[in-house]
Amino acid sequence: MQVFWFIPTHGDSRYLGTAEGARQVDHTYLQQVAVAADTLGYEGVLIPTGRSCEDPWVVAASLIPVTKRLRFLVAVRPGLMAPTLAARMAATYDRLSNGRLLVNLVTGGDPAELAGDGLFLDHAQRYEASEEFIRIWRETLAASHEGAALDYTGKHLSVKGAKVLYPPVQRPHPPVYFGGSSEAAHELAAEQVDSYLTWGEPPAAVAEKIADVRARAAKHGRTVRFGIRLHVIVRETEDEAWAAADKLISKLDDDTVARAQEAFRKMDSAGQQRMAALHANGVKRTRADLEISPNLWAGVGLVRGGAGTALVGDPQTVAARMKEYADLGIDTFVLSGYPHLEEAYRFAELVFPLLPRSVRDKLPGNVLNGPFGEVIATGIVPRVAAS
């Protein structure tokens, strides 16, 4: 099991859908979140992309010198740059970070945003172009280790003599992650990517996705790993966790939810449509309605695009729910919480000790419990209380 955190380049807050409690997200703050994730033992961080975010590659590059072991899951967007340019950027980043790059292929699902970026392909065409893009990207980087060039002719993209002179550290290329819920997305994942990511849906729905992608990959003679993108709201007790979930959306008003849902309806992303269906396009507003599966809460998706669900509960329950997903085949958990700095600490302190040994064995020594807390009086070293 791998556990990643999230760099909030689109903003951070204590509440959703309001400026109240908003936090200044500048470079100093992004560094704080990255250093916390690195220090606490998260294996990587996702850096999002889109017009609502700071540029992921610039942000990721700026975080190399302040981290030691943290890996960076950075987006590439087919259509915004040539695949060979993306390959050179990836190779350079991988070399400068000593092999810490992971690449997230993002096709895009908002026609308005895509049009603003000069992309006027429909859903099917975007996936065709994305398949050609990542094929050129992968094969160019693989060839770079031998000093070879690539010729490729496709429907949307073609290259002749494509070459990367300075190969990446990782062979044949940095691992490729990708998420999508349509049939076209599943086929692309099966044929081209290393890890398929799903947003946090109920376990039965996730199991169906895994089975479909796995079967498609087998037809291509490939195996694919699986990951899930979730928010987390964990507290020492269940009641405290659910109170925190209620507080997160306590400043929302009907107009804000309606405007968000209207924006989501204009998207042609199958994944976004599935997220919206979990809360009935904003109609569901009570805890009973929003808890769509035990401890899986759809409240975040009332106003947040993309990943819209959170695991809510005490440490033991959240760890148990993660195990349920792991038993389905999920091996990478990409997590986040509001605000991202404090919640990185809270999740690590409360849940990491309960996760499988494969996670605990990779944690930096004594980072979560010691060697001791604040000294009592002037010289008494505190001890761990008996359970």
From Swiss-Prot:
UniProt-listed InterPro entries: Alkanesulphonate_mOase_FMN-dep, Luciferase-like_dom, Luciferase-like_sf, SsuD_RutA_monooxygenase
EC number: 1.14.14.5
Catalytic reaction annotation: an alkanesulfonate + FMNH2 + O2 = an aldehyde + FMN + sulfite + H2O + 2 H(+)
Keywords, in A-Z order: Flavoprotein, FMN, Monooxygenase, Oxidoreductase
Domain of life: Bacteria
Matching Gene3D superfamilies: Luciferase-like domain
SUPFAM superfamilies, per the entry: Bacterial luciferase-like
HAMAP family: Alkanesulf_monooxygen
Function recorded in the entry: Catalyzes the desulfonation of aliphatic sulfonates.
PANTHER family: ALKANESULFONATE MONOOXYGENASE, ALKANESULFONATE MONOOXYGENASE-RELATED
Name this polypeptide is given: Alkanesulfonate monooxygenase
